[in-house]
Every structure is written in C-alpha cells, then in structure tokens.
Design a protein with these regions (language model features):
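Solvent-exposed helix-coil-helix hairpins and adjacent flexible coil/strand "hinge" segments
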Residues: 109-140, 165
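Periplasmic/extracytosolic POTRA-like scaffold domains at the N-termini of outer-membrane
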Residues: 1-22, 64-90, 132, 150
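Short beta-strands and strand-coil junctions in structured, solvent-facing domains, enriched
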Residues: 4-5, 25-26, 35-36, 45-48, ...
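Extracytoplasmic/luminal low-complexity segments enriched in Pro/Gly and acidic/polar residues
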Residues: 131-174
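Short, glycine-/polar-rich solvent-exposed loops and beta-turns at beta-strand/coil boundaries
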Residues: 11, 29-35, 111-112, 161
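Extracytoplasmic segments of membrane-associated envelope/inner-membrane machinery
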Residues: 37-114, 120, 126
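Short, well-structured beta-strand/strand-turn elements
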Residues: 20-35, 107
Length: 174
C-alpha cells in the first residue's frame, strides 16, 4: 500500500503480509521510536525436496520455496501425499543411516497413495518395496545386491522386492 508515516503503520497488517510468504514460518514486527520498524522473520528450513516442487522441514511441514534460495545445498528427494510427509521423512532417516553403514547411498524415498514404498539409490536404481513393512525387504536387498550379475552393456533399472522371498530385477541398455 501507500506510505503512512511512522504512526500510521499497522504492524499487525505488515506481520500478516510477511507471513503469507510461503517460506516464512513466523514474523514479529514492532515500532521503534522515533522512526524505525523492527522486523524479525523465522524461516522454514528445508531438509528434503518434497514431490519435486516443494520442500519439507525436519518436523514434516511441507512448504514452498524458490529453488534458487537453496544455493548449493544438495537435498534428498522425498515424495508422497502431504499427510505422509513425517512418515516418509522418518523412513528416509532410518534407511539413509542403515544403507550408509553398508556403503550404499540413498537418493530418495517415496510412498504412493496406496501406501507402496519406493527407494531410489544414488545410481538411480529404484527399489520397489510395496506396502507394509519395508525393513525386511531392504535387508533382503542388501543381502542379494552384491550377487546380482548384470548382463554386459546393461544397467539395472529397478529391483522388485515385493515378493515374500527373493526379488526380480529389470536391466536396460546402459
């Protein structure tokens, strides 16, 4: 709006306008005599990219942020319905730690609308885990992965671990 001078400024309105910015968690605006406004902003801190276009905080809050605000930060890719954000983030933390201990790097974790889990490794291999408890399926993957022989000139696209025992994999031309 228009400039209203020091006394004419509505600090509540300024605060509300600042809080409409998607990455602003909260704002405090105060008048400081004789002619200043004090503005304090609290921003959401992204820990992962959510559904390719948004971000998620460590407590599972989904929010928007211009990609250029990330600078050089490399974040994992997580995905799923917004109400599942905290569950996916917790799964990411567990899977990332478990795999790191086994010298495997996870790039992303997602759950679909039906509750089926999927993990993407840093080499772009997708692990299809299906619904339910994914932990034993990932344990099985860690056991069989070193034994998989990929045909010459091919690369693994995905490994399907939805079976009760064993797995299937799909290899495409590299």
């Amino acid at each position: 709006g228009s400039l209203k001078g020091f006394w004419g400024q509505d600090v509540k309105q300024i605060q509300e306008q600042l809080e409409t910015i998607p990455w602003v968690k909260g704002a405090v605006v105060r008048k400081i005599w004789p002619n200043r406004l004090s503005i304090w902003l609290s921003e959401y801190q992204p820990v992962a990219i959510w559904n390719k276009t948004e971000f998620v905080t460590k407590d599972g809050t989904v929010f928007q942020l211009p990609m250029d605000k990330l600078k050089e930060k490399v974040l994992p890719y997580l995905g799923g319905p917004d109400y599942q954000s905290l569950k996916v983030l917790e799964a990411w933390n567990q899977i990332f730690a478990d795999f790191k201990a086994k010298n495997l790097v996870v790039k992303g974790v997602a759950i679909d609308d039906r509750g089926a889990w999927q993990v993407t490794l840093d080499n772009d291999i997708v692990l299809k885990l299906g619904r339910g408890d994914w932990k034993p399926k990932l344990d099985r993957f860690v056991t069989i992965y070193p034994q998989i022989e990929v045909p010459e000139g091919k690369r693994i696209d995905y490994i399907d671990l939805r079976y009760a025992a064993g797995a299937a994999f799909w290899a495409e031309t590299a």
